[in-house]
Amino acid sequence: GWLLAFHPDLLCSTSLGRNIKNYSFFSYHLNEALHLSLREKDKAIECMYNIEKELQHAIDCHSKTLISRYIELLLDYCSRFYDRQFITRNEVNKAILNKMDIALDGYIQSGQLKNGVLPSTKYCADILHLSPRYFSDLLKFETGKNLDEYFQLKRLEVAKEMLLGKGYTVSSVAEKLGYPSVQYFSNLFRKLVGVSPCEYRLSQN
């Protein structure tokens, strides 16, 4: 097997140093690791051989740049392979998102939104037994949205249902769903739906 380890000084003033924070898979749990195909494994080994060959070359003013670029190339391939893995695990990912939706529904029904506390990435990741970074990447890959954006739309759908039900005023909907004020809720609703909450209720009845 292979182990790649490098000193942080290698990152200084390099493209890898500027981009290392973008490789979110460094924060994944062990059970979220890559499952490489044979072709992907060959490509990863090729990258490692290139790094090894450069390390065996006499050190000169280009060594640091070339080694860091080879490492960055390997990490870029890993990003590509993770995208492939997300695609091939489509059904598994859908099941995970269904569990997330159930958890978010429960969070809304619990009344915690009244205190203005929105569900966090860690909250959802813990329920799903995932690392926060893996959960965020999965959600972004499947929906194109981060948790705040996704929950914003989900909360809006719940607001629509409440407006069409009996016993809820616009004010009570805004309060139950944790919006900071009725005016904020009304303005946001109009922006996203195209009509005010009252107009929406009238148009559907």
Tell me what each language-model feature is.
Residues P8, P132-R133, S181-Q183:
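The DNA-contacting recognition helix of HTH DNA-binding domains
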Residues D42-E91, A95-I102:
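An amphipathic alpha-helical interaction segment
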Residues F141-Q183, L202-N205:
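Terminal helix-turn-helix DNA-binding modules in bacterial transcription factors
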Residues S186-N205:
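…primarily DNA-binding HTH/wHTH and HhH modules…
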Residues I96-D148, K166-E175:
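DNA-binding recognition helix and immediately preceding turn/loop
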Residues G1-H57:
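A hydrophobic/aromatic-rich effector-binding and dimerization subdomain
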